[in-house]
Amino acid sequence: GLTILYEDRDIIVIDKSAGLLTVKAAYEKEKTAHHILTNYIRKGSFKSTKQLFAVHRLDRDTSGVLVFAKSAEAKENLKLQWKNVRKKYVAVVHGILTEKSGTITSYLAENDDYEVFSVKDSRKGELAKTRYQVLKEAKRFSLLEIELLTGKKNQIRVHFSEKGHPLVGDDKYGKKGEPKSRLA
């Protein structure tokens, strides 16, 4: 699940495990970091009106640090500062990249099946930029440091899949038939 790393009167910072959703989805309403933490701040009382706000999200299969605000005001203050936060990830991808560093830029759109993909027309998608640096290479895999310059749904997964180097363990955008593993 999750581990609380820091808490004060305005925020809760957690380490989210892979496999846990950040917030509810149509198919899952209770096994989410938001639901677990809301119960925590309400101390199990259904009568409590305390609220919690996700400042950002991580994909279900991604582990990492998440920030939740304990008030709408705290959330808005954090959102205003969020563009100044550097978002870095480490991921293992299939193959050896010819360019050892670079920036992937595309416009991302989503279809009715919730699949995200790049489009050429800027009016049909949202700008997404991903900077990367190869840290290490093995025979069939590369370890990357990835920095999100924008933060769109499934951005890292889509960018590297479309580049021909899907994330190891990604059952949505990755290699079909690969044994399940975890993402970044």
Residue positions per predicted region:
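Thr-Gly-centered strand-to-loop micro-motif
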Residues: V23-K24, S118-V119, L144, V168-G169
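RNA pseudouridine synthases
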Residues: G1-F117, R123-K129, E137
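Pseudouridine synthase
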Residues: K29-L37, S71-A72, E110, L127, ...
